[in-house]
Amino acid sequence: MKFRAALLFPLLALSGASQSVQPAPDASAIIRKAFSRQEDFFEQARNYTYIRHEETRRLDRAGKVTKAESNVHEVTILYGEPYRKLIKKDGRGLDAKEAAKEQRKMDDEIAKRGRDQEKRRRETEKELADQRKALAEIADAIDWHIEGQETLAGRPAWVISGTPKAGYKLKSQEAKVLTKMRGKVWIDREDSRMVKADAVVNDTISFGWFLFRIQPGFHFTFEMTRVNDQVWLPRHGWLKGTAKVAGLKTYRMEMDMRYSDYRRFQSDSRVVQSGPPE
């Protein structure tokens, strides 16, 4: 799943000890500035490789785990976009046959991306343009409220929540999806970066002509970490809830994603700067 919107709802706090009364910060202005920097995040993130740990658990009606699996991927950059190569499955390394299969898949993808560079560049430009419009619309469609201030990774962050404006007509699909959630976001005060989001779905979200439907109560969290004291990159993602496929199959699941071992990417002749990270 691409991490696109860590844009939901933030909280905020008042800057504390001053003898004079300080004007309340403008929550909407904080959100707009953070949203405007999202594209910088994509630009910076594709300069790093990392390890992605993913655990998926299937649940029964009572919430008990019925099946669990884990995958570890090495994420590198091919032609400006991330590529995930499986290196571990269910706690064990790949055997020679499995490793060779993964390498063939990677080689095939390198060849494919090399052929489709111009097409992928246009698709990425459109995707980023659509996201800019969606973010601008979300900033307008929500009444943002400062709720406090917290310290994340030793740094002060505004905590901001939001309530959709009654009667506001939304155009973009991403904006419509996010207004079906309730939650908050944390904005780093110094960098104006969105560094954490927490949201719960409060209305059914449908994708693909209603074939895939996320049910109310689905819970998402996402956190960032500061790497090399200069760029914010994903640290942890978690989700839990129920989804239905084609109105027939029900999936109850929990997924935990952790990101580690960030390293500055060393480009080679196959790399073309073009796309946002996963």
Task: Name each model feature, range by range.
Residues 19-182, 189-196, 200-218, 223-236, ...:
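Structured extracytoplasmic
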Residues 1-2:
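N-terminal secretory signal peptides that target proteins for export/translocation
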Residues 5-15:
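Bacterial N-terminal signal peptides
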